[in-house]
Amino acid sequence: MELYNLTAHELKTKIDNKEVKVEEVVQSYLNRIEKVDSKVGAFLYTGSEEAIKKAKELDNKISKGESLKALGGIPVSIKDNISVKGMQNTCASKMLEGYKSPYDAHVIEKIKNEDGIILGKVNMDEFAMGSSTENSAYKKTRNPWDLDRVPGGSSGGSAAAVAAMETPLALGTDTGGSVRQPAAFCGLVGLKPTYGRTSRYGAIAFGSTLDQVGMLSKDVEDCALLTKNIAGLDHRDFTTADIKVPDYTQFLKKDLKGKKIGIPRECFGEGLDESVRKAINEALQVLKENGAEIEEFSLPSLDYALAAYYIISSAEASSNLARFDGIRYGHRTKDYTDAVDIYFKSRDEGFGKEAKRRIMLGTYVLSEGYYDAYYKKALKVRNLIKKEYENVFKRYHAIISPTSPTPAFKIGEKINDILAMYLIDAYTVPVSVAGLPAMSIPCGMVDGLPIGLQIIGNYYKEDDIFNIAYSYEQSTEWHKMKPQL
């Protein structure tokens, strides 16, 4: 079997047992990228030389009898909005074309400290704004299950790279579903941790009260391994929590006896594809058989979550992206007459259509006369959603819903239908608005396309999510399915 077919924990075992060299593992993935990425389009930059150099260093350590750390020799690919020292960090935007990061993000420091190997930077929707990775200024990324379909977004490059077996692990960012939805579309495990569980230091901001670094992997154990080793307090991000990070691999048990799971009626109404509904219902039956108690409940505020999310996230984006003006940061136009002209033309040339749309919306809702009517009201809705979830979690260990109302859609199908594109995130957005942790795991196939099951946990209770996800995974075969490229 080719090394790229293996999971991260299988590779780690082989490396630790000296069955394979780290350089062989890295080379296997570099060869795979060379073979299939012209079809998939996941990578914006491959750090081949750096990766091979690091692999040789680790092999040298092993030859001296030293043990590697928790991520020893495992390649990880990084969404192109997370800073890796010396590598490009473009946010898939012309605004940051040619920019190389002078420092490592906190999560990258942790990967490097645990002997992980950074393989390269992967494609995304510009500034993480989108649900299909069609908003990249550089290339289209395709779904490895069907090259005519989107991989999801905004972390579509991360998901496509793992699904195409170009990398065993990938980091993305999740603001409103940008890790979970691509995981669902590409048949992967994707986790958005609790807001504050992972540091945002070094991740270029979109919506500062929503953004969270997330993980994509082939199975639940790989996700637990990566999460355990990148989560935790960082004094450079004051929103990170000083709460001990457990060893999530200890919660990978099949038995769900005593676990209570709630099913929100609002997530099973109009707009849900019947094939997705069927797959979710079958998954719930599996969890019941494994000992979980399951009951329906109502979460009325979910109907307002999408509107609140787009107001809050766009407001924060308009503020965060104001710095890219051609004067201090970002692309500067070559054709200008004065300073004001530089602002207008640089931003017009540097930002794509969706980024401009959200900046304009955000500026509008923050402007005098509209602040109270929109932004302030959205914050009130956010508090209402949080309170409803807090009450629900007094009764349940977890909540389950579909990750997305449909499987992956065709490239170009929704790009001009903004409402349809935004509705794709209807089930992931409320979780982000509340700051809760959630994971998408594969739970079925329809017409050759994967379907995702979303497991939502209480604040800092990722352990419950891992337990339920692992229980389902061990009772099914969906995580073993691989696309034919």
Swiss-Prot record:
Q: Where is the active site?
A: K79, S154, S178
Does ATP-binding show up as a keyword for this record?
yes
Quick check: keyword Lipid metabolism in the entry?
A: no
| Keyword terms | ATP-binding, Ligase, Nucleotide-binding, Protein biosynthesis
Q: Which GO terms describe its cellular component?
A: glutamyl-tRNA(Gln) amidotransferase complex
The superkingdom of the source organism is: Bacteria
Q: What is its EC number?
A: 6.3.5.7
Q: Which reaction does it catalyse?
A: L-glutamyl-tRNA(Gln) + L-glutamine + ATP + H2O = L-glutaminyl-tRNA(Gln) + L-glutamate + ADP + phosphate + H(+)
Q: Tell me one GO molecular function of this protein.
A: ATP binding
Name the Gene Ontology biological process terms: translation
Describe its function. Answer: Allows the formation of correctly charged Gln-tRNA(Gln) through the transamidation of misacylated Glu-tRNA(Gln) in organisms which lack glutaminyl-tRNA synthetase. The reaction takes place in the presence of glutamine and ATP through an activated gamma-phospho-Glu-tRNA(Gln).
What PANTHER family does the annotation carry?
A: GLUTAMYL-TRNA(GLN) AMIDOTRANSFERASE SUBUNIT A (PTHR11895:SF151), TRANSAMIDASE (PTHR11895)
Q: How does it assemble?
A: Heterotrimer of A, B and C subunits.
Q: Family per UniProt?
A: Belongs to the amidase family. GatA subfamily.
What protein name does the entry list? Answer: Glutamyl-tRNA(Gln) amidotransferase subunit A
List the source organism.
Answer: Clostridium tetani (strain Massachusetts / E88)
Tell me the lineage of the source organism.
Bacteria, Bacillati, Bacillota, Clostridia, Eubacteriales
